Amino acid sequence: MKPFMDADFLLQTDTAKTLYHEAAEKMPIFDYHNHLNPQEILEDRQMENLTRVWLGGDHYKWRAMRAMGFSEDLITGNADDYDKYLAFAETIENAIGNPLYHWTHLELQRYFGITTPLSRAAAKEIWDEANAKLQTKEFTVRNLILDQHVSHLCTTDDPVDDLHCHLALQKEDFACRVLPSFRPDRAVHLEKPDFPEYVEKLAAAAGRTIASAEDMVHALSCRLDFFLSAGCVVSDHSLEGCFYVPCTAAEANDVFEKRMNGGVLTEKELGMYKGFLLTNLGRLYHKHNIAMQLHIKALRNNSKRMFRALGADTGFDSMNDFAFAPMLGTFLNDMDEDDALPKTVLYSLNPGDNPMLASMAGNFAAPGIRSKVQFGTAWWFNDHKYGMESQLATLSSIGMLSTFIGMLTDSRSFLSFPRHEYFRRILCNQIGNWVENGEYPANLEFLKEMVENISYNNAVSYFL
């Protein structure tokens, strides 16, 4: 029997161990997509206890706790922090096979030096030891980031945000670069009830009137210029349902006017407006050399009762299953026809789309850019061991694993950076298996460089 999560965790061959310990383990982290709060980084917040740092905004954990039957008061409610923690400890003890189990114990080991498995029986001992350390200066938010050798992290930000935290951090002596990401979902999703109110906010932020779809593009262009001044290198879009129908500017303007006048839009009209906005934004991204991330197929807020009670992003989303390959191909080609396709990263929440996305990415290339269109890492419901292995196998079978930009946390927790370690161990194990099965030569120096590139260097080259 192998020891529980020891130094060779998930590394099944000698080659895998060599690649991880001599290459992947030492590389810094470029976390190009997360949902961390930049205000907490600026303030260098000291987390009060494990409950605050673990359960403050993590819907992965909330879903698992609900599956255990705990009351909402112990999950997102006003219950005592220690009682919430005990409920989480019991949840983790029962979470065999779930990535939360491995993530939680990697966090305990890497940040706190705690190797005792979390359970209700061990909860008090772990609570006391971890909380004592959380009160020291070594465990402020900035030090948690530096502890994991994070060189860059990209937060997720709305075009109307003033980015005061990012701008202030630029003036401070903080070794990690905290960069904004441009996420204009609220400008794109005109079917949302608050779209008219958002148009007013965007107009105020951009300092210009918005009376048409073309005006929306101009306003977003103004805000993108501001984001670029704060170091933005990447955008992000959540695409749900029909997101592209070719149309003229006049047709997109008509759809915008209809929506602002209270009209009910057809699916085709939604696709026309969204496609017009997205292709124009894509051309702007290409002009400014920033990457475009497309996160596709989240089916959000399925429990309307809980959405009314708690709002969005609280653990009631799941995978969608609509077909979108022709639409995606036409959308990307629209920009490529003018040689205006930006670097693009494709993700689907439904793993059934993996072969399609990997093959789609190979349709669009450019001299001097390694894998200009990337098949993105296993996302959300897929960022577990099996999901990562599947994504790596699909990418290597259809595309080029060696040019892959690697992992991200997609997290709201400052303890989540060991997820990069989890990915790197799985990556090294996959490559190690190929080598020791005689499927690839044991050229360890070459392979170590490849692992270093996938772990960090490729992302630096791609985004910076």
Where are these regions (language model features)?
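Metal-cofactor-binding active-site regions of metalloenzymes
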Residues: M1-H288, A340-P342, L346-A358, G362-L464
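Short glycine/proline- and charge-enriched loop/turn segments
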Residues: F307-G315
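C-terminal amphipathic alpha-helical interaction region
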Residues: M292-L294
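Short, basic/hydrophobic alpha-helical segments
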Residues: F331-E337
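A short acidic, glycine-rich active-site loop
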Residues: T266-E267, F316-F322
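Divalent-cation-assisted or electrostatically stabilized phosphate/pyrophosphate-binding catalytic cores
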Residues: F324-L328
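Hard-cation-handling environments
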Residues: A298, S303
